[in-house]
Amino acid sequence: MANQTFAYVTDPAFVYGQGADMHSLNVLAAEIERTDIPVLLVGESGTGKDVYARLIHRLSGRGEASLAKINCAALDAGQLLNEVRAAFQFAGDVAEGETRTVFLDGVHELDAACQRVLLSLLPDGECKNGSAKPTSRVVSSTSCNFEKEIEAGRFRLELYFRINGVILRLPPLRDRKEDIPDLLECFLVKHSNELKKNTPELSREARKLLFAYDWPGNIRELSLIHI
């Protein structure tokens, strides 16, 4: 069921995986696809959090125009207030009665003032546009350890509880090296098609090097390989 659900993703390399961790991740994402429960995506940089946010939005049945991405690192409190309020309102290109997906990218980057603003807009983990019916689903992403951030007083516990209805943990590439050959083939085919060239084949020596490397940039780093 989950494999069929994820078969049409635009960039399947980020959600494909042979291991148990990726299977569990994809099954859980498929189970919550039609709900409005807040989702927190946790993973290192380059593990595909942005791709998963768009995937969750698409699987929810919401229209493409109703996805609003907010870069939390780039906003002060006033800007965040305007951005989030605008995202929570129905724009002209969103059908009447359709709920939006608001993607808070890098939510751990919010300072104390921004956290207060967001907390005031998420009274119970979802936004209600002046009515009892939710108008938006919130998906957040982070690359940090929230437990440490909360303990250090850098992130509000009550806000954490309101954005983590379900936590999806994206494993780093070094923990799923069995997927490297298939992931790389996907990217090489993509690059070759863009350049209108034949897809190259990897030598045995090249494969050994790929498996020996720890990939600190994760799948994003792998995707940049050109042969």
Region locations from a protein language model:
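Nucleotide-binding/hydrolysis machinery
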Residues: M1-H23, V27-T35, E44, A53, ...
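Conserved glycine(s) of the Walker
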Residues: G48
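Conserved alpha-helical scaffold flanking the Walker A/P-loop in AAA+ ATPase domains
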Residues: A30-E31, L81-F103
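Conserved P-loop NTPase "ATPase switch" module shared by AAA+ and STAND
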Residues: E96-A113, L118
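Conserved D-loop-proximal element of ABC-family nucleotide-binding domains
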Residues: G78, D111-A113, E178
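Short hydrophobic/aromatic beta-strand immediately N-terminal to the Walker A/P-loop
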Residues: P38-V42, F103
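AAA+/P-loop NTPase substrate/partner-engagement loops
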Residues: G63-A86
